[in-house]
Amino acid sequence: MSDVKLHRLYIHGQYTDATSGKTFDSINPATGEVIATIQQASQTDIEAAVKSAAEGQKVWAAKTAVERSRILRRAVDILRERNDELAQLETLDTGKAFSETSTVDIVTGADVLEYYAGLATAIQGEQVPLRESSFFYTRREPLGVVAGIGAWNYPIQIALWKSAPALAAGNAMIFKPSEVTPLTAFKLAEIYSEAGLPAGVFNVVQGAGREIGQWLTEHAVIEKISFTGGVETGKKVMASAAGSTLKEVTMELGGKSPLIICEDANLDRAADIAVMANFFSSGQVCTNGTRVFIPQRLKAAFEQAVVERVKRIRMGDPQHTDTNFGPLVSFPHMEKVLSYIESGKQQGAKVLIGGERATTGLLAQGAYVQPTVFTDCHDDMKIVQEEIFGPVMSILTYDTIEEAIERANNTNFGLAAGVVTQNISQAHQIIHQLEAGICWINTWGESPAEMPVGGYKESGVGRENGISTLNHYTRTKSIQVELGDYQSVF
């Protein structure tokens, strides 16, 4: 334990000791080893972070949009220069393969920051004439202090998705990463400070969501909460935010997304998409297409194509560059996923491949679960209805496309959906009927900075990324001007 680094909170541009006296450990899920000990924030520390953010936000908002953009662009450059260093830390903390974190997590996070750095100068109001002697104009003003609460599956990417539009609009952010993957948020805070962000504009507090999250959502000074996580927790955050000071919220929550493969689909392409939609990042992606609908007559050929591809997955040490499938994020999460797999077996689904914990050699030390494909699934099965957040695909057959659409929509979730077909007209007709916020045709999973991300139904409120997100980090002030005489009715 003497070699394990102790991490403090990051408040007002520097590391500072928490006052709670409590700590928690970050565990490498590939080995079970403790890699860091993190101090947990107290309510006193949250107050200090809010006070710091309020002070820093005034300095930040007073800068011109060009100045803010310049500082954020510097941060982008530093992120890209340190891509591999950050990716190695992310892999250590999350268990995700370095081949993934080095090409996706930091890269796409930096892309979003660069996108909003460019949009910082485009935040503007409008002027509208009312009559010859009067007009009104609007100002887009920052909210002030906002809070971001991150999830454990894309720690630094989520921190950037939340902080980039907030900072571009002139706000300060207090960010709480998941206690399961707490480390790269510290590095992002350091990078922001190095780039020239004023002290307090990006603070990092650590600890359990049920405590820290509640203090943030109920704080009177905090004007907005952006949360990524599970549906039930999201409902509590939203209720708390509404019950305190009626804060604005953005919620990116869970999913159980359908992937519909049409009669005319190229099965090789369909199998490629289905495997990527289920096993990328070891299946720990909110938008995963875990309900795969296939026409009955194509079932056997599709299953064979999927199994062939799953056999090519390279599970192993996530730090090795040839590994493309690492452990799950934690041992408790592994047990949860294994319990879902057991449920699938008990309810009569057939395991085509996988279905167990991976225990060969050094894999036994980590939270590894075999990529698992179930077939002969039914809509009422637990593995089909509930979000597993692991490497578990469920194959379901259908007779008509109308049936597939109806069943695809028969869920409380509505995060993502996809269609594979060679008939582009049919693709659009199907997509327009699917109740989901993020949809893909003949592909899966890409989320460019320009594309809004968010769900329907219980999968979320509001959007992240895209131009419109900036509107939710500002508020509009309307000002009428009268140039002529003023006539009172009294």
Curated annotation (Swiss-Prot):
Annotated metabolic or biological route of this protein: Amine and polyamine biosynthesis; betaine biosynthesis via choline pathway; betaine from betaine aldehyde: step 1/1
UniProt binding sites for K(+) 2: 246, 457, 460
Reaction catalysed by this enzyme: betaine aldehyde + NAD(+) + H2O = glycine betaine + NADH + 2 H(+)
Active site annotation, chain numbering: 162 (charge relay system), 252 (proton acceptor), 286 (nucleophile), 464 (charge relay system)
Pfam families assigned: Aldedh
S-adenosyl-L-methionine as UniProt keyword: no
Residues the record marks as site: Seems to be a necessary countercharge to the potassium cations: 248
PTM annotation (Cysteine sulfenic acid (-SOH)): residues: 286
GO MF entry, a single one: betaine-aldehyde dehydrogenase (NAD+) activity
Family statement drawn from the similarity comment of this UniProt entry: Belongs to the aldehyde dehydrogenase family.
Subunit: Dimer of dimers.
The protein's role, per its UniProt record: Involved in the biosynthesis of the osmoprotectant glycine betaine. Catalyzes the irreversible oxidation of betaine aldehyde to the corresponding acid.
NCBIfam families xrefs: BADH, PRK13252.1
Protein name per the record: Betaine aldehyde dehydrogenase
Native organism: Acinetobacter baylyi (strain ATCC 33305 / BD413 / ADP1)
Name of the gene encoding the protein in the UniProt record: betB
